[in-house]
């Protein structure tokens, strides 16, 4: 069986996961700001060991292309390119916003862009419905108040339904603790 390695270092969180073609089998996510280049390969190996798979079992590496930390994005891309060259597997890059939406349903994906701004992407059935953009918190509140559909909200670390505007805005402003990443 072939697997996909998922890697995101575009924020203060290191995210590493392994999936088969249907679901994520194992994932880790924790704050590793300024240490991602030091710990990413160790965490990849830890997941391989936990799943009892070998690197040669990976046929695809899925990596974030941003938005996010430029240095962080370069870390993940360097790891992905190195592994792809050694293993002969392909690389797929996805928007950081797209990595956290499910393939079915309507999602608004929101990432903290700092300075009271948010990266926002809208997706339906896994496909973007509008181009990703950057909004201030006030613009985001206004935009969300005009929505008539009932999307799920995918923040950087969780898919959340029925979250209030204030809670969501507080979360992306860093006023609430981070919640666990889930696919």
Segments from the language model and where they lie:
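Oxyanion-binding and handling regions
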Residues: 1-24, 31, 35-38, 53, ...
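Glycine/charged-rich beta-loop-alpha catalytic/anionic-binding loops adjacent to active sites
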Residues: 22-30, 57-64
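Charged catalytic carboxylate motif
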Residues: 39, 43
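Buried hydrophobic packing segments
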Residues: 44, 79-83, 101
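Phosphate/pyrophosphate-binding loops at sites that engage ATP/ADP/AMP, CoA/4′-phosphopantetheine
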Residues: 44-60, 142-144
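Phosphate-handling active-site elements
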Residues: 50-56, 85-94
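DPxDG-like acidic metal-binding loop motif
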Residues: 60-91
């Amino acid at each position: 069986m072939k697997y996909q390695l998922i890697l995101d270092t575009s924020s203060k969180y290191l995210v590493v996961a392994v999936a088969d073609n249907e679901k994520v089998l194992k994932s880790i996510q924790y704050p590793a700001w300024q240490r991602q280049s030091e710990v990413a390969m160790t965490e990849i190996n830890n997941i391989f060991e936990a799943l009892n798979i070998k690197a040669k079992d990976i046929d695809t590496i899925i990596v974030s292309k941003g938005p996010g930390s430029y240095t962080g994005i370069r870390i993940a891309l360097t790891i992905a390119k190195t592994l792809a060259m050694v293993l002969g597997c392909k690389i797929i890059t996805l928007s950081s916003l797209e990595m956290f939406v499910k393939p079915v349903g309507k999602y608004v994906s929101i990432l903290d862009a700092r300075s009271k701004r948010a990266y926002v992407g809208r997706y339906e059935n896994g496909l973007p419905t509008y181009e990703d953009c950057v909004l201030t918190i006030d613009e985001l509140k206004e935009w969300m108040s005009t929505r008539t559909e009932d999307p799920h909200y995918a923040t950087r670390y969780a898919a959340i339904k029925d979250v209030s505007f204030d809670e969501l805005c507080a979360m992306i402003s860093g006023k609430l603790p981070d919640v666990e990443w889930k696919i």
